[in-house]
């Protein structure tokens, strides 16, 4: 992979669906649009993931909402990073979401959400903060 910093604000993909400028950015400069992807819906993979770490308490939580075309995956993990490391993860899979989760096109703002009878999870990205909410019934029972 090239070590190239992308600094110009531009669309992520060209008209043919290929990357306009491969590389990395220090800020969000590449603009994503699901409509620009030239692949079948079942091959489009979108996700939102957060890892929240408390160094003071040696614990962490990881939260994922993903729409991977042919499969959806929602998971929550609790990690104890202390003297006796331990983790527990619960995952819900769904067949063929194919864009129905309507994940935001930008990490700057928007709401990512998933809800069913066992899990209510949403990530709210606002102007000055992000709110991560997770109500996972019977988590680790």
Go through each PLM region and give its residues.
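Targeting-peptide/extracellular-domain and disordered-appendage signature
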Residues: 1-141
């Amino acid at each position: 992979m090239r070590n190239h910093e992308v600094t110009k604000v531009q669309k992520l993909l060209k008209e043919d669906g290929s990357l306009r400028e491969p590389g990395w950015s220090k800020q969000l400069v590449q603009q994503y649009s699901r409509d620009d992807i030239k692949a079948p819906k079942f091959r489009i993979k979108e996700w939102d993931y957060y890892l929240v770490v408390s160094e003071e308490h040696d614990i962490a939580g990881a939260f994922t909402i993903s729409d991977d075309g042919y499969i959806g995956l929602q998971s929550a993990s609790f990690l104890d990073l202390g003297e006796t490391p331990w983790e527990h993860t619960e995952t819900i899979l769904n067949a063929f979401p194919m864009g129905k989760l309507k994940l935001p096109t930008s990490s700057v703002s928007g709401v990512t959400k998933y809800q069913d009878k066992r899990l209510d999870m949403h990530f709210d990205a606002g102007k000055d903060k992000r709110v991560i909410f997770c109500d996972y019934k019977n988590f680790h029972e």
